[in-house]
Amino acid sequence: MKRRNFIISSLSGIAAASVASTPILSSCCTAPKEKKQETPLNLCLQEGVALGDSLEEKLDFMEAHGVTGLEVGGGNLKSRVEEINKALQGRNIKASAICAGFSGFILAEDEQKQQFDTTMREIVEAAGQIGSCGVIMVPAFNGQNPCKPHTMDTRNYLCEQLHELGEFALKCGTTVILEPLNRRECFYMRLVSDAAAICRDSDSEGVKCMGDFWHMQEETSDYAAFMSAGTKYLRHVHVASRGRRLMPGEDGEKDDYRDGMRALKEMGYQGHISFECGCEGDRATVLPAALDLLRKQWEEA
């Protein structure tokens, strides 16, 4: 029965989140059509993906290729606030999401929970200081132990903990961003709709979620995944090739993102699509080609 209640509560997020971000027709009367505003494609690179030996060189590369977001890791972020703010000053690039970097995990049943609370809040505070949109987190990876059991009580506990963390993030001027993973990496939260439902039930504007083209392909359609969260909850997107998690385009025809991009355009998504991937070929050639591929598919979506 507990499992049934858990599933019902999670799946209801699809309808609730979508309705929250979808306009409702108030009448069938013909009205003048307003010109639809185009949704921009905002591209972002993780710091380790961009070309360059220093942060300045990486940002120079990004500016030269029209990339407007920088995703950095959360490890030692507190000590890098001044460096990052100085490097971004005067550029058309801003700090996007922060990629984890904390110790422990939120569903731990031992001292790892305290480690999470301390380090996560430190990263969240630093994220606000560099103008980041949020800190990415996964409630629990496969293999992390001891972990709370997969029950409705655990889900309720998670929502309570996220409410507190989300409210703290808001005070810091940022958010926390839940990332669903595929079943090989995470037993707990695999669907964007699951994450959106947890955002809803956490009852804090400081709790958001994201989608990752790599993880989503194993669980649901890209279009359905993004639409299940809507603009109310969707804050960030990751992208990689769809065969080996390399640069978009390195897996050939498999690397088709147009279905998900169509959802992002229809909902008016304003966040970044960030490269989280490896690279097999010459990065100086492959990375610009990957950026061009995403721009082409965005136009076609």
Kindly give the residue locations of the regions a language model identified.
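Active-site-adjacent beta->alpha loops and helix N-cap segments on the catalytic face
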Residues: K78-A87
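Active-site-proximal loop/turn and secondary-structure-junction residues that shape catalytic pockets
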Residues: V49-L51, N76, G101-G104, F141-G143, ...
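Histidine-acidic metal/acid-base catalytic patches
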Residues: K2-C44, L51-G66, G131-C133, M189-G211, ...
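Mid-chain, structured segments of secreted extracytoplasmic proteins
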Residues: L88-K113
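Active-site acidic/histidine proton-transfer and metal-coordination neighborhood
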Residues: S10-S21, K33-Q37, I106-K208, E218
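Generic structural signal for hydrophobic
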Residues: M62, L88, I123, A127, ...
